Amino acid sequence: MLNINFVNEESSTNQGLVVFIDEQLKLDSNLIGLDQQHHGLISKTIQNKLQFTGKYGQIKVIPSVIKSGEVRYLIIAGLGNEEKLTEAKIEELGGKILQHAICAKISTICLKLTNRISRFTSQTFASLVASGAFLASYRFNKYRTTLKEAEKFAVESIEIFTDNSTEAAKLFEVKKLIAEAVFFTRDICNEPSNIKTPQVYAERIVDILEPFGVDVDVIGEREMKNLGMGALLGVGQGSQNESKLVVMEYKGGNKDVPTIALVGKGVIFDTGGISLKPSSNMHLMRYDMGGSAAVVGAMIAVAGQKLPVNIVGVVGLVENMPSGNAQRPGDVVTTMSGQTAEVLNTDAEGRLVLADAVWYAQEKFKPKCVIDVATLTGAITVALGSTYAGCFSNNDELADKLIKVGEEVNEKLWRMPLHDEYDAMINSDIADMANIGNVPGAAGSCTAAHFIKRFIKDGVDWAHLDIAGVANSNKASALGPKGAVGYGVRLLEKFIKEYI
């Protein structure tokens, strides 16, 4: 694991030295001194605008001209317009620096924060850069028996030279905890579905959360049947692996602090059931439990900080498999709420899982607010691509807060509409509702949201986050490799911390 230290005095044992320069390309007195030590290498580089313009995210790795000493490379990082810098951009810059260091095979680097960054203290800037680098260091290689030499290389340590190293280290300690929660989410999403059965996944949740003082209850199929969870159980009835409902309760606040319920879709693998998906890219359905993983990650981040809040997490863990015992198109299931649903498409299963999970959360814990997170519909990806997740809500203030926090942590949300006409599209001829809309190909993400909305009690604030387009990526980003993104952990953690 990457080791990050904050120091008041610069060490001479680092192979790479990082400095930051904005688009004005001006050197302050500290950078002038550093430039002189390196025989004008920094000033020569920024004078040649073909090499370096100072725009945000530009990284220039230059071999050092100093013959003695450990520093082999200078790494110049562009800040762009400092007035436009955000916390998310600074974190991404940290990730890019780490990636360039890996490409240049620089195993130890020092970040020198000599110039003042407008709007950010040096310790805040330092902790954000460190957070981005730490997030970018994530790898999932546990099933790789051989690695290429380039893949084996990793940056061993980062030393950050700042004027208040103690405060920077305290800030980073929290960010590191949140990053480790993101890593859990990425790990469990990347895990092959033959390994992370509902039982194994539930055990991992217990193992990770109980040391933080979170009460975890794993409910099996017999108890779910007694509770009347016909919708969730119907999804999993074709699998030989028993479905689980995992209930996590963190009581960090006083009794008068309202409870928030986080509910996640945990479809361990989604074949589509009898409404079978095409085989192309079906392997990516290992990520169909990304909503549940985001909920667990948020619980880790909140409980790890001992925040004075009351949070409940409920995740339904099922496999949607075809078999002689599988749910059929046209089946009618009775949900825990007593409402009935006609299953017109067994591949619209996530909303069935959520229907019972959100009802259970409301019945048992009486939350003020319910936020469900799910890789629910392909339709949201058609609408928003991989840039935004969809946000549906019955409360404008709740939606606005989530969207604002999403911008701040670069886990973006776009408000999507709820409307009576969408709700009417899920009416069924033989049951209370159908699990898909009655107009093929129309408003798929909106009708799915309305299905869940029918299980939200009056007076409960609710938001539904459809993360199908953002939970995993087929390309690397500044903050991590391709595969599971860990989307939602930082969004939910910051929302809970700032608004509860």
Swiss-Prot record:
Signal peptide as annotated in the record: none
BP GO annotations: proteolysis
GO CC annotation terms, alphabetical: cytoplasm
GO molecular function terms noted in the UniProt entry: manganese ion binding; metalloaminopeptidase activity
Gene3D superfamilies named in the record: Leucine Aminopeptidase, subunit E, domain 1 (3.40.220.10), Zn peptidases (3.40.630.10)
Protein origin, superkingdom: Bacteria
UniProt-annotated binding residues for Mn(2+) 1: 270, 347, 349
Active site: 277, 351
Protein name per Swiss-Prot or TrEMBL: Probable cytosol aminopeptidase
Gene that produces this protein: pepA
